[in-house]
Structures are given as structure tokens and as C-alpha cells.
Amino acid sequence: MVQASMRSPNMETFKQQKVEDFYDIGEELGSGQFAIVKKCREKSTGLEYAAKFIKKRQSRASRRGVCREEIEREVSILRQVLHPNIITLHDVYENRTDVVLILELVSGGELFDFLAQKESLSEEEATSFIKQILDGVNYLHTKKIAHFDLKPENIMLLDKNIPIPHIKLIDFGLAHEIEDGVEFKNIFGTPEFVAPEIVNYEPLGLEADMWSIGVITYILLSGASPFLGDTKQETLANITAVSYDFDEEFFSQTSELAKDFIRKLLVKETRKRLTIQEALRHPWITPVDTQQAMVRRESVVNLENFKKQYVRRRWKLSFSIVSLCNHLTRSLMKKVHLRTSEDLRNCESDTEENIARRKALHPRRRSSTS
């Protein structure tokens, strides 16, 4: 008989049983500051999953581990979603020190790793991947769930050994349900991909995800990052000023349709930014005539620069994301007088997930994070 933890009705219940009694725990897939991800096999079915062991914060005064409330929010959101382009939560266990999420195993690695191995890529092929991302986000936004951490590392492939791999959005640690009439502000995410309203500590909504999709698309087509500066301050300033361009060196073979799609996403005013429905209807994603379809087919992605910049980007991100996120927290904390420990937790959580993927988020059938 399964015993659930006794908690108030509005709190998530996790099984208070040893996960090892139901799953054979295998090799480590990744690790981070507050989580370890291991491959596992369900004893009753033989099916493989990924077990994410999240270290619980033991007291409010501590900054080690993840607070129960944040874990519950992530689990609550994952239990609400069921979509082909979103990772699936199978089960949740809890012991004295950890909460263990049993997640879908995604073995195809990151989308950008897959693209970096290709010899050529047309915009038509690129939009097939962007469309899958949009489909997953559309499902979330229909439920008024904002992901708040869309970035290349959180876009995985179910299986890379097929012509058009199936995309899975992962890592719902920062996801949040947007409630009508309830103002939500926070400092979180990976600075390179966060919207101006996050940097400025303004009310947040679904629009922040659309900005991130614009940044992801820009990088996918060129290898260059629109706002990443030489310093932390420059990156944040570029975001708030929406300071970017389509350098001819990187975008000489990019269609005007693709540039228009990006321009309409990288808009500072949230009301003027494309919604998810508008993005899906954009002619670069859904051509309205044969001419537009031909433009996509004949325009190509700058894979040479993509590969060159991607290797550099991966190294730079792994080296600098901790200091960049901490800078974002410190500077904005002074502005709004936030509690230091809680803001740093958000940044540390994001850093954890980046580190966790270094080892083997790529060779598996699911992602290390939800």
C-alpha cells in the first residue's frame, strides 16, 4: 500500500517510501549544487527513467538545498502538463534529505548539440524545430504557465537518430502559474536569455517566454548571441536597451522573414511582443503562399559560425554563469530591497541545472531536470 505524506490539501504529496524499493538506481547522468540525476529502471515494468535527487533545504536560515515550497511548485506544474513536446513526470518520492522526481528519460541530447553536428541546415528545417518549441510553449501558455527558463540547454531531443528529432522542453524549476490580477515579480533565469522586465524587476507574465524564444532563434540561425557582452554589466545593459543588430557577417544568408520573426519577439514593451499564437501564425513559421515557403527552403543557417561560436559559448557559459547570475541578483536586490538568501537561491538553482548537464544530459532518453 502506497503511503502519501500527510500535508494540507493545497500542498503536494510525495510517496514516503524508499525509491530503491521500486527502482534499480543506475549510473549518474549529471550532478549539480543541489541535485544528482541517475538513470533508473522500474522493477515492476523494466522501463527506464531518470531519477532526479533534489537535496531539501533543512531550515529557513540555511542556503543549502532547495526549499520545499519550490519543489512543490515544480511538481504541481509537472503534474498538470501532458504534451508531446514537454517532459513527463512519472512519480515522486521523498525521504529525510531528498525529494526524488522520476522523470521521462530523454536520450537524444540537446538540440543545439545535434545541430552542431550537421553539415547543412535550411531555414525550413530550422523552423521545424522552432515550431515544436512553440507548440510546447503554446500548451503551457494555454494553461497560463510560464516556463521562465527557456534556453538551449533546456531544449532536448527524445531521439536524435531520426531525420526530424522530437523536441522535449525540460527543467520546470522556475516555471510559474500566472494568475489574473496577481502581480508576480522575481529575479531568476539565465541572464543571456531573460527579458528586460526580469532585469528591471517589473511584473512578469507569459511574455517573458516569447523574448527567450527570440534569443534562441537568433542564436540558432547565426551562432551569435544578440545581447551577450564582454562584461556582466554590458550584457544586462544590452538587454534593457534592446541593443542588438543583424550583423552581415552572421546573417548574410538569413531571410527577411526570419529576421522579422526575431524583431517582433525582441520587443521591450510586453504588449507589443508577439504572443505565442501570433508567433505560430507568423509567415516564417506558417507560410501563407509558395513564395514564402520557397524563401525558407532556399535560405540557410550559418552553421559554420554556429559550430564555432557554440563551442566557445558552451565553455564561456559553464565558466561565467555563476558570477553573472550573482551580479544580476546583487544589483537588483539593492534596487528593490529583496531578501538576499531567497534571490540567491533562484540563481543557484539555475546554475545547478547548467552544471548538471555537463556530464551526460545528452546520452539519455530524458533530461536531468524537469
Swiss-Prot record:
* Traits of the deletion mutant: No visible phenotype.
Can you list the GO cellular component terms from the UniProt entry?
autophagosome lumen; cytoplasm; cytoplasmic vesicle; Golgi apparatus
- For ATP, which residues are the binding ones? L29, G30, S31, G32, Q33, F34, A35, I36, V37, K52
**Domain Protein kinase: where?**
23-285
| Protein family per UniProt | Belongs to the protein kinase superfamily. CAMK Ser/Thr protein kinase family. DAP kinase subfamily.
GO BP annotation list: anoikis; intracellular signal transduction; neutrophil migration; positive regulation of eosinophil chemotaxis; positive regulation of neutrophil chemotaxis; protein phosphorylation; regulation of intrinsic apoptotic signaling pathway
Q: What is this protein called?
A: Death-associated protein kinase 2
One GO MF term attached to the UniProt entry: protein serine kinase activity
The UniProt subunit note reads as follows: Homodimer in its autoinhibited state. Active as monomer. Interacts with 14-3-3 proteins YWHAB, YWHAE, YWHAG, YWHAH, YWHAQ, YWHAZ and SFN; the interaction requires DAPK2 phosphorylation at Thr-369 and suppresses DAPK2 kinase activity and DAPK2-induced apoptosis.
Q: What is known of its domains?
A: The autoinhibitory domain sterically blocks the substrate peptide-binding site by making both hydrophobic and electrostatic contacts with the kinase core.
> Is DNA repair tagged as a keyword?
no
Q: Which residues carry this modification: Phosphoserine?
A: S299, S318, S349
Activity regulation as described: Activated by Ca(2+)/calmodulin. Regulated by a double locking mechanism, involving autophosphorylation at Ser-318, calmodulin binding, and dimerization. In the inactive state, Ser-318 is phosphorylated, and the kinase is dimeric. Activation involves: dephosphorylation at Ser-318, release-of-autoinhibition mechanism where calmodulin binding induces a conformational change that relieves the steric block of the active site by the autoinhibitory domain, and generation of the monomeric active form of the kinase.
Q: What is known about what this protein does? A: Calcium/calmodulin-dependent serine/threonine kinase involved in multiple cellular signaling pathways that trigger cell survival, apoptosis, and autophagy. Capable of regulating both type I apoptotic and type II autophagic cell death signals. The former involves caspase activation, chromatin and mitochondrial condensation while the latter involves caspase-independent cell death in conjunction with accumulation of mature autophagic vesicles, plasma membrane blebs, and nuclear condensation without DNA degradation.
Q: Which CDD domains match?
A: STKc_DAPK2 (cd14196)
Modifications after synthesis and translation: Autophosphorylation at Ser-318 inhibits its catalytic activity. Dephosphorylated at Ser-318 in response to activated Fas and TNF-alpha receptors.
Q: Where is this region: Calmodulin-binding?
A: 287-354
The protein's required cofactor(s) are namely: Mg(2+)
EC annotation from Swiss-Prot or TrEMBL: 2.7.11.1
PTM Phosphothreonine: at which residues? T369
Give the catalysed reaction(s), semicolon-separated: L-seryl-[protein] + ATP = O-phospho-L-seryl-[protein] + ADP + H(+); L-threonyl-[protein] + ATP = O-phospho-L-threonyl-[protein] + ADP + H(+)
